[in-house]
Amino acid sequence: MLFRSVEYKSKYGSGEPTDVMIDALLEDFRQGDYKRIIAIGGGAVIDMAKILVLDGEAKAESYYRKEVPLRKVRTLLAVPTTCGAGSEVSNVSITEITSIHSKLGLAVDEIYADEAVLIPELLRELPYEFFATSAIDAFIHAIESFVSPKANLYTEDRKS
């Protein structure tokens, strides 16, 4: 039997992710037995979904502070709906920890998406202003990969 569930970020809040939003999502999520996460949205949605691939019963803050073992137990398919965040190809998730009024980042290989699917039609529905700013963001990320002191063989090969 195929079991599926759809959770909407708007149910948990809007804007940039917070630990409170992720904890509410985790509470609902842990009531099921999911093998795969499909995150369709911008960077905030994908960043929140990255935490869902991890094992355990911890609160969001414990994951971001690395107070618990970080073990990936689910696959993540990321489908971005903007063109600038890059969350679908990074191992980083950022959230605000409300108790300290500050953002924390988690950068570990366990939260890389297993697959990223780019669907150009999803960008057609973006308001022009949002499309333009996210496209500029994507362009800046591309430049950054060339000038970064952490450039790698992939980006170095593209310079010639």
Map each language-model feature to its residues.
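Short, small-residue-biased leader/transition segments that mark boundaries at the very start
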Residues: M1-L2, S160
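Conserved beta-strand segments of alpha/beta enzyme cores
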Residues: R4-V6, T75
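Short beta->alpha junction loops
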Residues: V6-D19
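Glycine/threonine-rich beta-strand-loop-alpha-helix active-site module
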Residues: V20-E27, Q31-P120
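Carboxylate- and glycine-rich phosphate/diphosphate-binding segment that chelates Mg2+/Mn2+
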Residues: T95-K159
